[in-house]
Amino acid sequence: MPKVPETLAPRRTSRQIRVGKVLVGGDAPVSVQSMTTTPTTNINATLQQIAELTACGCDIVRVAVPNRDDAEVLPIIAKKSQIPVIADIHFQPNYVYAAIDAGCAAVRVNPGNIRKFDDQVGEIARRAKAADVSLRIGVNAGSLDRRLLEKYGKPTAEALVESAVWEASLFEEHDFHDFKISVKHNDPIVMVKAYRMLAERGDWPLHLGVTEAGPAFQGTIKSATAFGILLGEGIGDTIRVSLSAPPAEEVKVGLQILQSLNLRERKLEIVSCPSCGRAQVDVYKLAEDVTSGFEGMSVPLRVAVMGCVVNGPGEAREADLGVASGNGKGQIFVKGEVIKTVPESEIVATLIAEATRIAEDMADAGAPSPSGKPTVTVGR
């Protein structure tokens, strides 16, 4: 593998907290979160979705607790989940206490809509501390306190930060410090501004998120833009990509963002040209076929799928494994050396065979067993 480039900036120094078995902040890796979309009371469906999220690399999962029935099943969900569970609480402070008692790893509280929240802080802090449960102060543009909306006229970055800092100070007055903060907005520009301001105000670990980001394509672009800016500046300790899409897609996008910024080990990466009039092979289909064939592998390999002789040979030589196509044939490269030329119809099978061989060699040398799915990067 080529040497992994350095990150754009050193990580911001933040205090470290624990969310179950996952460390957040400090020198811990940036973690990826998602949220279940099933009714929490449907225990089997919720646990099945958590299992799917775990399998695709999710570190922490959040579940909704909109009513008493949801609160009552939290002990089962928390006990049987493979990854730490955060209870997402709005409106009812009693559900915060229920989540703490249920054994959830953490609780997200929304200071903008929990009844008389400031009056509840002392008791929440006491009980969370006794149970070794961390919190997230989750400030959201869509549910900002009325007083701040009147002061600023709308949910500005300044309003979000003022809310977060005020609530943080209340918890700290009660000697409770095991919390992270989020200041989410659906506008990436406002969101970035808010997190930059918040990062200057204290050493709290920060949970990044663009709220209500939208459908998969739009939400991916908005989240990648905002996260890329902040994480590139060293700001951010855990992320959640909010998409109107299956939760597993949120995790895949989040992991790809971290890998692209060298904040996670790069897994199987397929570099394919965007195609043009010079292409002598159907690059789109070839890249899709290679990706499908590599499903189930996540070894750290860079595989180049190139459609012509302009960038093809050079890009393929820079990859661990690659093909440069033309005239109905494909030159197969391994570590920069041409090992064979095969008919176009055999390109995919040959790449898969060589990738499998390399993966087996890595396993024999003590590398982790391949798992998960490859990612596709379209380049050039």
Curated annotation (Swiss-Prot):
GO terms, molecular function: 4 iron, 4 sulfur cluster binding; 4-hydroxy-3-methylbut-2-en-1-yl diphosphate synthase activity (ferredoxin); 4-hydroxy-3-methylbut-2-enyl-diphosphate synthase activity (flavodoxin); iron ion binding
Catalytic activities: (2E)-4-hydroxy-3-methylbut-2-enyl diphosphate + oxidized [flavodoxin] + H2O + 2 H(+) = 2-C-methyl-D-erythritol 2,4-cyclic diphosphate + reduced [flavodoxin]
Domain of life: Bacteria
Cofactor info, note text: Binds 1 [4Fe-4S] cluster.
S-S bonds: none
E.C. designation(s): 1.17.7.3
Keywords: 4Fe-4S, Iron, Iron-sulfur, Isoprene biosynthesis, Metal-binding, Oxidoreductase
Residues binding [4Fe-4S] cluster: C273, C276, C308, E315
Pathway info: Isoprenoid biosynthesis; isopentenyl diphosphate biosynthesis via DXP pathway; isopentenyl diphosphate from 1-deoxy-D-xylulose 5-phosphate: step 5/6
Cofactor: [4Fe-4S] cluster
GO biological process: isopentenyl diphosphate biosynthetic process, methylerythritol 4-phosphate pathway; terpenoid biosynthetic process
Record family assignment: Belongs to the IspG family.
Entry function: Converts 2C-methyl-D-erythritol 2,4-cyclodiphosphate (ME-2,4cPP) into 1-hydroxy-2-methyl-2-(E)-butenyl 4-diphosphate.
Matches recorded under PANTHER family: 4-HYDROXY-3-METHYLBUT-2-EN-1-YL DIPHOSPHATE SYNTHASE (PTHR30454), 4-HYDROXY-3-METHYLBUT-2-EN-1-YL DIPHOSPHATE SYNTHASE (FERREDOXIN), CHLOROPLASTIC (PTHR30454:SF0)
Name of the protein this chain belongs to: 4-hydroxy-3-methylbut-2-en-1-yl diphosphate synthase (flavodoxin)
Organism of origin: Leifsonia xyli subsp. xyli (strain CTCB07)
